[in-house]
């Protein structure tokens, strides 16, 4: 008889199971097929069936072609000072990197003919960035501020502008890639334009602003005249290893911990955020007692009374930042990128409703892919070098404080959208406001969901076992979450 290779399942039940497995294991890495394909420059020549392991590559695959992408990353920490971005240096770096990556295509080793064929026909490259957190530290922008949103938008537009222009200049010098005719580039459709295509396909608004700071007319005219050397130009990889070598923070992520223990063949040693140390020294606050406080509170400066409010805002760790705010930053960068970004989700609590809110916000804002879900355990290694009488026992983490519900469109929501400026105050600085306009408010509006959401889906489950698994997500005291 005929074997059915599929079965019909209820979408809501499948979604619940996906979120449960995600919370339990950090997998699966949720990828959205509609933006990955609708926004692909190569929609005329195949289908994006999957991403790569780190979820930043969205290229076509088939039985005759295996997608291959050569990657490189711009170290923002080398292009940003307290005075701002060195745009001249950054433009040269991007142009040099694009030429380098195009050269790699020709001299690379290909394990299969399918891989060689794909790379030679389409010549995709993935230029990304790292040291985003370094740049924000230097510019004094907290990660969840309007200034950070404005910077994410501005810096990615600049990199996109010069990456696309560099590829087109290479096309004028070396010729356009083989499958260029019929591509979005050939039709005059750039990454920013594809948000409108996605919006039209879904029939709902993609609440990401389409504003630009640069004059794109020369780039569009150059591409129309000479074509593109590379089918794809940008992708933000995790850069965990190369950023460590370069001495910067990885890719687009906030600082994981202000203090941690690093291990290598030479042994173990304590690493402390040098930006934080320098700021504390400048204020006369860096001493042995402050070091002990940092150790006791696992690097969370928000729990140290002696640290000024400005520094508490600037040096928030990844788990102290609302995950939906990080999604918003990725959406602002993503509108300029023709592939995707390795976006890790950091969640401090154990709320199933919050987990759904984060991933629904990612879809609504048009993200193509997500990477690991990273969560904090309820316990940690006991800090035996600290005075237990003074600091108490340090093996159990404090539960995340619940946040008050915010009605959509309320003044409180607008304040959340703006976050804080570089001075640690609640209002955004005038420069950030002028640069962003209504951007943060529009984006933040998508992160507000009804209380019914995930909680209602739990109530409707028919399996007692499934109910137990899901309910544990909302129970901080559940042993399964320890």
Language-model features, listed with the residues they occupy:
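Acidic, low-complexity intrinsically disordered tails
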Residues: 384-482
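Structured core elements
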Residues: 24, 29-32, 70-75, 124-126, ...
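Catalytic alpha/beta core of large soluble enzyme barrels
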Residues: 58-60, 101-106, 176, 209-213, ...
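Function-dense linear segments that define catalytic or interfacial modules
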Residues: 22-119, 124, 131-139, 248-275, ...
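A glycine-rich phosphate-binding loop feature that marks nucleotide/adenosyl-phosphate handling sites
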Residues: 32-43, 114-125, 149-154, 169-197, ...
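Internal maturation/activation junctions in enzymes
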Residues: 93-116, 142-239, 309-313, 341-342, ...
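Polar, glycine-rich mid-to-C-terminal structural blocks
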Residues: 1-25
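Alpha-helix capping and helix-loop boundary segments enriched in small/acidic/polar residues
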Residues: 5-9, 42-45, 58-63, 81-92, ...
